[in-house]
């Protein structure tokens, strides 16, 4: 499914803020000081059914589907509220860059993307605002979950040592997941029996995606339980511990965690791939907007730096030392040293990945301020000790992040005021 089509399902939360008023619309759910309207739920259902029809995917009964959609809308609303609470704002520059990336990933121009969105009954402005909201929610979630993650140096060293003993090859798995969640007062043995019954049905040929839609309470339930392609090192620990050398089509489980019982299916496996790290040596000049220096002023000043460098009036290093507000690199003529692009924020990463060597970028904005950057060199690096430690840290971070984000969402949901309004209350 195209990226923008997946995002259409997100065009639900507080939909009344960006769409035309709907006659006799009703409040379906109260979430803290916000609401989810019945039209939001109806739009989500319509979109999901349309996408399922196009892909030939079976959906569960209407009641089960409605419950899954309402659960997702509640979580989406809470994340949007968290973004508002901590003051996350996505400006037009970052928004435009994100939409351009969506278009590139779909091999479309912006006009083609806009036309495709319109064919789904969504205006381009509605789409833009939803992407802005999705970005803000994602940024808030990432920031708040990162604070909860602690990685000890010994953990990094131990994992780096293990990785260094492996070959350059790694196997990727496409994983399907069903989670049956414990609830207060529930008989855990009854839940285990249900999980075993589902496993038997799956082994007899039941469709995994349909079973996930119907029964799963996991984070990918509305995607039919599909976690996509992952190496073991990228998976949540509870997944990785269960996967040994099983073949495509294997059903694994049920197995128990602190939140419930889990069932996995290996939808597909693809083989060995060589691990090679591309490192980029770049230098930059950073200007931070202030009350005195506006965004436009920062852009003008950086454009003047570019002119002076090209005219031979000053070198990049001289200007970085004199003007850059990144103290760590300014003293080094703006040079950042060899780094993997993944270590940078998305906008900066895009620049250092795509700029030709020796080319200075146009001014661009990140969360840190306004930059110009020049790529000095690129190199391919094998498994050096430094690369292994960077990789080990990313693996540990991703693993803990995937585990912690679920716990954070549960806590967010548990601490929220949520009231589902039934028809009688609306009619009354």
Curated annotation (Swiss-Prot):
Going by the entry's taxonomy, the superkingdom of the source organism is recorded as Bacteria
The UniProt keywords, alphabetically, are:
Chaperone, Isomerase, Periplasm, Repeat, Rotamase, Signal
Its EC number(s)? 5.2.1.8
Family matches, as Pfam families: Rotamase_3 (PF13616), SurA_N (PF09312)
Catalyzed reactions = [protein]-peptidylproline (omega=180) = [protein]-peptidylproline (omega=0)
Q: So which residues are the signal peptide here?
A: 1-19
Q: Signal among the record's keywords?
A: yes
Q: Which GO terms describe its molecular function?
A: peptide binding; peptidyl-prolyl cis-trans isomerase activity; unfolded protein binding
Q: Where is the PpiC domain?
A: 170-268, 277-377
GO annotations of cellular component type: outer membrane-bounded periplasmic space
| GO terms for biological process, alphabetical | Gram-negative-bacterium-type cell outer membrane assembly; protein folding; protein stabilization
What is the predominant subcellular site recorded for this chain? periplasm
Instruction: State its location(s).
Output: Periplasm
Asked whether the keyword Isomerase is assigned, the reply is: yes
Q: What class of enzyme is it?
A: isomerase
UniProt free text on domains: The PPIase activity resides only in the second parvulin domain. The N-terminal region and the C-terminal tail are necessary and sufficient for the chaperone activity of SurA. The PPIase activity is dispensable for SurA to function as a chaperone. The N-terminal region and the C-terminal tail are also required for porin recognition.
Q: What does this protein do?
A: Chaperone involved in the correct folding and assembly of outer membrane proteins. Recognizes specific patterns of aromatic residues and the orientation of their side chains, which are found more frequently in integral outer membrane proteins. May act in both early periplasmic and late outer membrane-associated steps of protein maturation.
The record's NCBIfam families line, in alphabetical order, gives:
PRK10770.1
Q: What is this protein called?
A: Chaperone SurA
Say which species the protein is native to.
Vibrio vulnificus (strain YJ016)
